[in-house]
Amino acid sequence: PKFGVVESADQAVELSRELGFPLLVRPSYVLGGQRMKIVISEEDLERHVVDILRDMPDNKILLDHFLDGAMECEADAICDGDEVRIVGIMQHIEPAGIHSGDSYAVLPPYNLGDLVIQKIEEYTKRIALALKTVGLINIQFAVKDDEVYIIEANPRASRTVPFIAKSYGEPYVNHAAKVMLGAAKLKELPHDPHMDGYAVKIPVFSYEKFPNVNKELGPEMKSTGEAIRFIPDLRDPFFRKVYSARNLYLSK
């Protein structure tokens, strides 16, 4: 999506008139979606930017045009500098705008078309090579009207790697470590993923320990862990229940 970088509230308001609302506002160099927020007006934008700069002076702030109603997906891959091996593509159940750590996600994707999957694979390989990645990389995508948009790329191990490795029964962290140490190239490492049906990533929340936390989900992460559930197919009652409630906690 269209984006820009600002260092003051005045710059943010000026850029917002070019990008258009709604906007995703996020400070640089944070984890877990800290201080990220979706804003829908100049007043909301100015207030949030001032709050960020008060607590994080001299930090750059990223503004992205928010794709309302988009699906979110992510791909994990290993790159050895010459070759890229995509180890998993996951599709979130909640719409884009919910932090990836707070979303239910399904491996492999449950309703992405072949064209969209091909684009995700192509973009993942091109980005991994362009960044000169040696090891693991995680890339998050938003999909709307069969167009694939890049949200962010993180050339590191993501929280999804253990989930994918357990789902497919493959030692991906071990493979990535060998690649990073220069002990092996991808073509020298075995790759035989297998899974019957689908694996569902289930976010775990600790609201009973933090009763005063706002339970509305958004771009700032609130989960404290995750679990895994295997289902035979998409007719499974658990998947149907989660899918039917995918918009339940999405804040206005």
Residue locations for each model-derived region?
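A conserved helix-loop-beta module that forms one wall/lid of the active-site cleft
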Residues: P1-R35
